[in-house]
């Protein structure tokens, strides 16, 4: 087994060799518009997966992914020979070509973010003249908490009537009315 750093270096080199061969050496019209985006090599360096994208002939043309896949399959042997000559490893990895869907995912994510921004802008327009439904501060309670007359602590008012009782706060829930002996 090779270490991960060697596998990454080999994958990078394979991607560069395949991209160069597709662009300059292999004259298959089905490979026009094919771009190599990435390559991954297994830990034993015997298999390589090469990721590619396909562009249309113009900006408005749909890419011919099936034609590009067929052209890559036809050129697989030549590309593997070039990879073997260019890398100098004892065993030339077998090449597998996979259509890279990252660009489609990025495009879909951009669309979702644009929709979210539009929804945020609509919400901001609605908020401009909006007022709260109730009071400005619904949690404010005028005069319900007062200082405790009990020494050393705060109290909690248990009712707001004329017979309001201040209950001292105690720590640990000790109310003093249990039957345990005091130490």
UniProtKB/Swiss-Prot annotation:
Cellular compartment(s): Cytoplasm
Keywords: Cytoplasm, Ribosome biogenesis
Gene3D superfamilies per record: 3.30.300.20
Protein name: Ribosome-binding factor A
Top-rank lineage group of the source organism: Bacteria
Family per record: Belongs to the RbfA family.
Gene Ontology annotations of biological process type: maturation of SSU-rRNA; ribosome biogenesis
Segments for region (Disordered): 132-183
Function statement: One of several proteins that assist in the late maturation steps of the functional core of the 30S ribosomal subunit. Associates with free 30S ribosomal subunits (but not with 30S subunits that are part of 70S ribosomes or polysomes). Required for efficient processing of 16S rRNA. May interact with the 5'-terminal helix region of 16S rRNA.
CC terms in the record's Gene Ontology section: cytosol
Record-annotated membrane-spanning stretches: none
NCBIfam families for this protein: rbfA (TIGR00082)
SUPFAM superfamilies referenced in this protein's UniProt entry, alphabetically: Ribosome-binding factor A, RbfA
Keyword Zinc attributed: no
GO molecular function, one term: ribosomal small subunit binding
Self-association and partners: Monomer. Binds 30S ribosomal subunits, but not 50S ribosomal subunits or 70S ribosomes.
């Amino acid at each position: 087994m090779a270490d991960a750093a060697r596998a990454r270096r080999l994958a990078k080199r394979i991607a560069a060799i395949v991209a160069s061969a597709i662009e300059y050496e292999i004259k298959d019209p089905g490979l026009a518009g094919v771009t190599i985006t990435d390559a991954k090599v297994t830990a034993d360096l015997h298999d390589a997966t090469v990721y590619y994208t396909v562009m249309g002939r113009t900006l408005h043309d749909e890419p011919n992914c099936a034609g590009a896949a067929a052209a890559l399959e036809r050129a697989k042997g030549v590309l593997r020979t070039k990879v073997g000559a260019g890398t100098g490893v004892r065993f030339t990895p077998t090449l597998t070509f996979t259509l890279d869907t990252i660009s489609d995912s990025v495009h879909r994510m951009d669309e979702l973010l644009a929709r979210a921004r539009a929804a945020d802008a609509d919400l901001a327009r609605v908020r401009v003249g909006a007022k709260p439904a109730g009071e400005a501060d619904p949690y404010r309670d005028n005069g319900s908490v007062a200082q405790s007359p009990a020494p050393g602590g705060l109290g909690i008012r248990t009712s707001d009537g004329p017979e309001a009782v201040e209950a001292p706060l105690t720590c640990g829930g000790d109310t003093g009315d249990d039957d345990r002996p005091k130490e």
